[in-house]
Amino acid sequence: GNHDYYGGTLSDDHLLAEHARSVGAHYVQKEELHHGDTRFLCCTLWTDFDLLADAETAMGIAGSVMRDYSRIWVDPPAGSDAGGGISWQPSATEIEPADTLGVHRDHRAWLEDKLMSPHPCGKAGRTVVVTHHGPHLSVAGPVDGLTPAFHSDLTDLIARFAPSAWFFGHSHRRLRAMVGQTDIRNVSVGYCREFLRPESEYLFDAGLWVSHNGS
């Protein structure tokens, strides 16, 4: 997610992967996983800020209020002694929305390439997309000026490839919608304090997925 880069840079994936491996976890940035007849295509995704067809305004709002743009830093210049990575002291320059837009384009290109690739189980195989940011307005909840920093409109991609399901988080709202043949669900775990609110008890089971055959 976006918070994993706080205190570091957007190019820290290799360091985050090392941390994950050190505790026996998988780091699945732009990675494909397989379980039975299901493949999982995983990436952070970020957004294109164009959900409401005004990317320039959305980028301005996001840049002025979101902590991402004050807690994630531009990579130190090549050859500098800054060291890089999630343990180095912040540079004088924070990232801007244009930087995360660039990452979104990269992640989306990777995702489209994977969706175009034949499923190893053929037509019987299922594809589940797992991203941090949301892919559709129908699962965005109440819309305001910040919503385009949480969700993109990937209707065209969903229609073309019809993945079986799309799981995402970021907005911490338990929303679900069928878009064409794709079951889109917010499976956020949420912040620790959210477990203290009775209306958020659903977060305990929000990460569970039951397949169509009940298994």
Mark where each language-model region is:
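Active-site-proximal loop/helix segment associated with metal-binding centers of metalloenzymes
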Residues: L41-T127, P135-S138
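N-terminal active-site segment of His-dependent metallophosphoesterases
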Residues: Y5-S11, L15, P97, K123-A124, ...
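Active-site glycine-centered loops adjacent to acidic/histidine catalytic or metal-binding residues
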Residues: G1-N2, H132, G169-H170
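Metal-dependent catalytic neighborhoods of phosphoester/phosphodiester hydrolases
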Residues: N2-S22, L51-A53, V139-D144, L175-G180, ...
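Binuclear metal-dependent phosphoesterase catalytic core
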Residues: G141, G145-S164, H172-S215
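Beta-strand-turn-beta hairpins that frame and shape the catalytic cleft
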Residues: E32-C42, T47, M178-D183
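A conserved beta-strand/loop element that lines the FAD pocket in flavoprotein oxidoreductases
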Residues: A25-V28
